[in-house]
Each structure stands twice: as C-alpha cells, then as structure tokens.
Amino acid sequence: MGYQKVVLVAACNILNENISKNDNVLNQNNNINNINNNNYNSNDDNEKIIGNNNISTNNSNLILFNQNNNNNNNCHEERLECQVPFEYIDVYGNADFSFLKYTKRSEFRKYLKKAYNIESLFDKSFRFNSITSFPTIKYYYSLIEDDENIKKKIKEDSYLLLV
C-alpha cells in the first residue's frame, strides 16, 4: 500500500510569566488563523482531540525543527513528517483525515512522544494545560510525484484545531 508524505506543523505560543492564563495569545498571532476556542473547557478531563494513531510513520525520514516567527517572539512551531495512505489522498493531492482517531489529550501527548521522541513538546514552554499555549496543527500536503515542480508545490489547505 502506498503512502503520501505529510508534514504536520504544530504551532503554539510560548507562555511566559507576564502572560495571563486567560489571555488568548493564539488569536494575537497573525500567522495562525481560523482559531475557534469557544468550546474549550480547561476543566474537562475527558476532552477529546484528534490524534493520528493510525498514521504509519517513518522515523528515518522524520523532519523536526523549530521555526521562530520574527513578528512574534511568542510563536513556536514543531514540524513532523509522517505518511498518509494513498487511498486518503485525492487526485489533487489533498489528504482526507477522516480516518484519524479521536483520543484524549494525554493519549495524544504519549503518542507524539513515542512516535517522534519529542521531548521539547513537553517542556514548560510547550504546555497543554491552557488555551494560550495549546497548539494548532497545520497540514502541508507535499506531493511526491516524479515531477519536481509538483514536488515543490506545498498546500496549506486546512487547520486542525486541538481544542
């Protein structure tokens, strides 16, 4: 079965001592759009998010790096490369993520740590306990046809909000 490479970008805002827990820092970042956190409940232990337990990963091809936003010192990104089965990719290269499994937030953290061995996602600068630091995940669809021009065509079609 073939796979399509997909780069996941987890973008969050790093908290500091001067930022109130109730501040909506994510919405202050002009590079992160379409944020809707009206249904966020920080006291809901059963809150579900979308995890990607069903994505087959290839750690040898893992891309992981931080990218700081020059316009906002509080912006932090983690980029991960994984693979999506071809049957979930349409003829235009768009990925259908309907197969992604819903998991609890803690399970999603364990998955990321196990699959990618990412310690930096869980340090004090990347906390999951408040809306101000909770990440969004953007999917960049990278086509892997032989044509180099198509390979370079990166799509940023949707946001997956983990709130």
Swiss-Prot record:
<protein>
    <recommendedName>
        <fullName>Uncharacterized protein DDB_G0276289</fullName>
    </recommendedName>
</protein>
